[in-house]
Amino acid sequence: MNRLDWQPRGLWYAAEGMPAEVWKDSLNKNPAAQYVSGPFDIVPLNDRDTLEYGGYTLRCIVTPGHTPGHMCLYIPEEKLLFSGDHVLFDITPNICAVAPGDDMLGEYLSSLEKIRKLDIAVTLPAHRGTGKVDVYSRIDALEAHHQKRLEEVLDIVRRSDGINAYTLTGLMRWNIRAKSWEDFPAGQKWFAMGEALAHIYRLCVLGKVRRQLLDDGHVVYHAV
């Protein structure tokens, strides 16, 4: 993704209530937006494709959620899962909406259930620690976390009918070193907004929240 690819997302966030100075500052300070990617060769992989490395056969498990194309790798004989950023043990993976009205959170939750069906003894995440619990207990915890988040977002919408996503994001609880929403670093506001939208859109899919497009192009939300 190059820098120009981020401009439509900024305009989308603006329609969801993020002030222009905030999303532009987020764009300027986001390391991922600083690099223009050149062309390179790729080898597309699909669910249940296999890779052969070091005498092991790794099965590809497509697990959209953290990103649309996220993939875990599984070695059935070893009961070993390379979980990437799909399952992390000491933080919750960031689940952001990637397009207006999508259901990335719904896809993530479905992907967790997909992993639950595997026979796994060892889980190796992309970063941070492996934790002190098995992957199935961690899946339970991640699902409970997002259920709690959905309830929090729905409660905010019920108490603030016609709220926009940016204002709602500022009313959510965040585990970050900042005294208030106004003190959040611009880059963190960007990620927080994406995560809030993922939960809002999930509630829309569930029929608990309604999305309204105003005449001026901005979007607000109502509890159903």
Describe the role of every protein-language-model region.
Residues M1-E52:
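Active-site HxH/HxHxD metal-binding segment of metal-dependent hydrolases
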Residues V22-I42, T57-E152:
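Metallo-beta-lactamase
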Residues L45, T67-P68, D216-H218:
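Short acidic/glycine-enriched loop/turn segments that link adjacent beta-strands
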Residues D47-T50, H70, K208:
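Short, acidic/polar N-cap/turn motifs at the starts of alpha helices
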Residues T50, P64-G65, L214:
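Short polar/acidic secondary-structure junctions
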Residues Y53, L73-I75, R211, A223:
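Conserved hydrophobic "DFG−1" position in protein kinase catalytic cores
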Residues D155-V224:
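C-terminal regulatory/interaction regions
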